[in-house]
């Protein structure tokens, strides 16, 4: 199975590549080239930095229409990580109101947790699972993942696979059809993070066989 990690100068691509290499024998390509993206079995959209800068980079590399064609029209599985998850939504208020990819209804807002909690939210936090038969079915007692972010995704409940508590309940992971997002960093979340990536890739294999995920 060929996995393409989208390279648009805004992501921690090597850490994600190394994490996947620990999971199994996959063909992993880090690229922003159109033909390579079209040939992928699934895509990973990483992201570190500011939302407006990321959208500008995607636009400059002429990736927005291409990715939309692959993901929305051809229904290629995609995993957005951290900022990459936020880009999947309609807009973000980071720095200035900026239009996102718009693949999932929802908007990205600054965290306002109250209770003297610090922003950015940095460190380990426990997931609250919202759905059965999801990508996180492997989790048992330990549900901790590593987060680094100042904004969160405000979206309808039906798209949420998991949330976390930080003053208020916020979105940790989403899924809409072939589109999956993880606000935490699976590549930095040790065993749980590797298993989250493995679960996503196993789900991709199921999609390739034409079997829907419950």
From Swiss-Prot:
The active site is at residues 82, 185, 187. SUPFAM superfamilies: Class I glutamine amidotransferase-like. InterPro entries: Class_I_gatase-like, GATASE, Imidazole-glycPsynth_HisH. GO terms for cellular component: cytoplasm. GO terms for biological process: L-histidine biosynthetic process. It catalyses: 5-[(5-phospho-1-deoxy-D-ribulos-1-ylimino)methylamino]-1-(5-phospho-beta-D-ribosyl)imidazole-4-carboxamide + L-glutamine = D-erythro-1-(imidazol-4-yl)glycerol 3-phosphate + 5-amino-1-(5-phospho-beta-D-ribosyl)imidazole-4-carboxamide + L-glutamate + H(+); L-glutamine + H2O = L-glutamate + NH4(+). Its EC number is 4.3.2.10, 3.5.1.2. One of its GO terms (molecular function) is imidazoleglycerol-phosphate synthase activity. Residues 2-210 form the Glutamine amidotransferase type-1 domain. It is found in: Cytoplasm. IGPS catalyzes the conversion of PRFAR and glutamine to IGP, AICAR and glutamate. The HisH subunit provides the glutamine amidotransferase activity that produces the ammonia necessary to HisF for the synthesis of IGP and AICAR. This is Imidazole glycerol phosphate synthase subunit HisH 2. It comes from Vibrio vulnificus (strain YJ016). The lineage of its organism: Bacteria, Pseudomonadati, Pseudomonadota, Gammaproteobacteria, Vibrionales. The gene is hisH2.
């Amino acid at each position: 199975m060929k996995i393409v990690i989208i390279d648009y100068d805004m992501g921690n691509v090597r850490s994600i590549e190394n994490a996947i290499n620990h999971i199994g024998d996959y063909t992993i390509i880090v690229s922003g080239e159109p033909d390579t993206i079209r040939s992928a079995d699934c895509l990973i959209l990483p992201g570190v930095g500011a939302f407006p800068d990321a959208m500008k980079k995607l636009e400059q590399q002429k990736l927005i229409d291409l990715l939309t064609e692959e993901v929305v029209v051809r229904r290629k599985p995609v995993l957005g990580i951290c900022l990459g998850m936020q880009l999947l939504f309609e807009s973000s208020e980071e720095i200035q109101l900026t239009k996102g990819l718009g693949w999932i209804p929802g908007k990205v807002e600054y965290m306002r947790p109250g209770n003297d909690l610090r922003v950015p939210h940095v460190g380990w936090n426990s997931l609250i699972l919202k759905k059965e038969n999801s990508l996180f079915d492997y989790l048992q007692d330990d549900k901790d993942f590593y987060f680094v972010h100042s904004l969160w995704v405000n979206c309808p409940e039906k798209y949420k696979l998991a949330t976390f508590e930080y003053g208020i309940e916020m979105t940790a992971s989403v899924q809409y059809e072939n589109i999956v997002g993880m606000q935490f960093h699976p590549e930095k979340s040790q065993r749980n993070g590797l298993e989250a990536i493995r679960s996503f890739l196993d789900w991709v294999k199921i999609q390739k066989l034409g079997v829907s995920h419950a």
